Amino acid sequence: MGELADPVVIGTITAPHGVRGTVRVRPAGEGRHLREGLSPLVGGRRRRILRARRTPKGFLVDLEGVPDRFRAAELRGEDLLLDRSELDAPEEDEFYVADLVGLEAVDERGGALGEVIETFPTPAHEVLVVRGEGGLLYVPFTREHVPEVDPRAGRAVVRPPEE
């Protein structure tokens, strides 16, 4: 990742769109960093976002140096990365999905369930993957299942879904 000291994924290119180099991007989180003027690292180089618009299926983004569908198709699967220092400061009670990895997952009584080892998006919401003594636990990242997150304390209160 070269020039990024603390890279954070802001989105992933899922497909080309049209013939003029536009790419479809699945945002990480709400996608507030997918906006004109920012220059994420994409495919090994910085590419300025020339235009970004939200759609029901994610975002459509025009990137500098991607003039046609063929170049756009070559970027399928590439992450858009910014250094953490380039991100907007989170609002109060907000955090980045990347900040969830490494948190201790505890139940409502404070009992250890394991560690959040990764997250992944689904059409409905992010899912936390918690590794504990009993194996992997997949937890929808919703208020119902994760009522409290405290990155400073390094923990998240988790209500695992009923089997």
Curated annotation (Swiss-Prot):
GO biological process: ribosomal small subunit biogenesis; rRNA processing
Cellular location(s): Cytoplasm
GO cellular component terms, A-Z: cytoplasm; ribosome
Alphabetized UniProt keyword annotations: Chaperone, Cytoplasm, Ribosome biogenesis, rRNA processing
Pfam family, one: PRC_RimM
Record's function text: An accessory protein needed during the final step in the assembly of 30S ribosomal subunit, possibly for assembly of the head region. Essential for efficient processing of 16S rRNA. May be needed both before and after RbfA during the maturation of 16S rRNA. It has affinity for free ribosomal 30S subunits but not for 70S ribosomes.
Protein family membership: Belongs to the RimM family.
Protein name: Ribosome maturation factor RimM
Species in which this protein is naturally found: Rubrobacter xylanophilus (strain DSM 9941 / JCM 11954 / NBRC 16129 / PRD-1)
Gene designation: rimM
